């Protein structure tokens, strides 16, 4: 593999492969350290989302709290708890693993671990960096979530998947 670009936390490598029929081919692969995402559900039955600007799509998105696994060797649960505190100012009594998913396996090796967080309580937090400073926390009632997906307000795939999987662990609404 040849590294053709090295960024802050991403690398792009050109790799050679041999197909089952023996044909050789190359692919550019984005190397990513992985990420975590958290579905924080309040006692009132809402999910805490963050509204933040995403330069890659030039749009403000509503997403579950998430972040890169940027501390080598740190357990994903620890990273998830840190992101929950940093982005929405909460600690979780319970953190339940929902899925470890391959985000875009056609060109990237990133895996994201998604957790359900319940038993939320406020904690002091310090947002840092341009993206986190401008976050807005929005509580969306779970019964409104699907309508926000349907109307294109929520478009982030890990948010849609995370909430869908979290619902399996929550009591029925009503």
Question: What are the residue ranges of the model-derived segments?
Answer:
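Conserved Nudix-box catalytic region and its N-terminal flanking loop in Nudix hydrolases
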Residues: 37-82, 99, 124, 131-132
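Short, well-ordered beta-strand micro-motif
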Residues: 14-16, 40, 116-118, 139-141
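Nudix hydrolase/Nudix homology domain
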Residues: 23, 60, 97, 101, ...
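Local beta-strand/beta-hairpin segments that build beta-sheet-rich folds
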Residues: 2-5, 98
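Acidic, metal-coordinating catalytic segment for phosphate/diphosphate chemistry
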Residues: 4-44
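Active-site segment of metal-dependent pyrophosphate-handling enzymes
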Residues: 11, 33-34, 54, 63-66, ...
């Amino acid at each position: 593999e040849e590294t053709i670009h090295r960024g802050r936390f991403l690398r792009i490598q050109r790799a050679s492969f041999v197909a089952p029929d023996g044909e050789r081919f190359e692919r550019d692969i984005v190397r990513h350290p992985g990420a975590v995402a958290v579905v924080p559900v309040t006692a009132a039955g809402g999910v805490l989302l963050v509204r933040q600007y995403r330069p890659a799509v030039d749009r403000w998105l509503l997403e579950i709290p998430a972040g890169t696994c940027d501390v080598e060797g740190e357990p994903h649960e620890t990273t998830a708890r840190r992101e929950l505190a940093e982005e929405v100012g909460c600690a979780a009594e319970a953190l339940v693993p929902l899925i470890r998913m391959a985000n875009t396996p056609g060109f990237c090796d990133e895996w994201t671990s998604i957790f359900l967080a319940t038993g939320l309580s406020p904690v002091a937090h310090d947002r840092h960096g341009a993206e986190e400073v401008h976050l807005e926390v929005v509580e969306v009632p779970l019964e409104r979530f699907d309508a926000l997906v349907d109307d294109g307000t929520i478009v982030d795939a890990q948010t849609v998947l995370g909430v869908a999987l979290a619902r399996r662990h929550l009591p029925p609404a009503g």
